[in-house]
From Swiss-Prot:
Protein name: Protein COLD-REGULATED 15A, chloroplastic
GO cellular component assignments: chloroplast; chloroplast envelope; chloroplast stroma; cytosol
Range annotated as the organelle transit peptide: 1-40
Source organism of this protein record: Arabidopsis thaliana
Entry keyword Glycosyltransferase: no
One record GO biological process: response to cold
Function: Exhibits cryoprotective activity toward stromal substrates (e.g. LDH and rubisco) in chloroplasts and in protoplasts and confers freezing tolerance to plants in a CBF-dependent manner. Protectant against various stresses (e.g. cold, drought and heat stress) by preventing protein aggregation (e.g. LDH) and attenuating enzyme inactivation.
Subunit structure: Forms homooligomers which interact with potential stromal substrates in the stroma of chloroplasts. Interacts with the galactose headgroup of the chloroplast lipid monogalactosyldiacylglycerol (MGDG).
Main subcellular location of this protein, as a coarse class: plastid
Domain of life: Eukaryota
Further comment: Remaining soluble upon boiling in aqueous solution. Oligomers can stay soluble with small structural change after boiling and freeze-thaw treatments. Predominantly unstructured in solution and mainly alpha-helical after drying.
Length: 139
């Protein structure tokens, strides 16, 4: 795509034009004191030319850009708020889990201690019984 412009038009245009690549951008060139010439790339390689003013594509583009920016900002804030809620929920559940684990560990320790005492008593009774049998056998 070849274009030729005078030096006055090219001043400030920088790299607004491209060849072959898909880009979504716009560039503005100041032509006169109050006139602004805008080049907006639209779909593949077609370009739209507009003078800045009421009811042209630049105003629509600015409005759409602002709406998109506001939408993204709102959604980002919502996502951050949801992330905070999720973090608070996880912290709450972790503390509940720690409390539950502590209580269950105490119950398990008490159970093991009780069963240990029962086993010791049975062992003592068994030993006493065997000792009594041995004593009787030696008589």
């Amino acid at each position: 795509m070849a274009m030729s412009f005078s030096g006055a038009v090219l001043t400030g245009m920088a790299s607004s034009f491209h060849s072959g690549a898909k880009q979504s951008s716009f560039g503005a060139v100041r032509v006169g004191q109050k006139t602004q010439f805008v080049v907006v790339s639209q779909r593949k390689k077609s370009l739209i030319y507009a003078a800045k003013g009421d009811g042209n594509i630049l105003d629509d583009l600015n409005e759409a850009t602002k709406k998109a920016s506001d939408f993204v900002t709102d959604k980002t804030k919502e996502a951050l708020a949801d992330g905070e809620k999720a973090k608070d929920y996880v912290v709450e559940k972790n503390s509940e889990t720690a409390d539950t684990l502590g209580k269950e560990a105490e119950k398990a320790a008490a159970y093991v201690e009780e069963k240990g005492k029962e086993a010791a008593n049975k062992a003592a009774e068994f030993a006493e019984g065997k000792a009594g049998e041995a004593k009787d056998a030696t008589k």
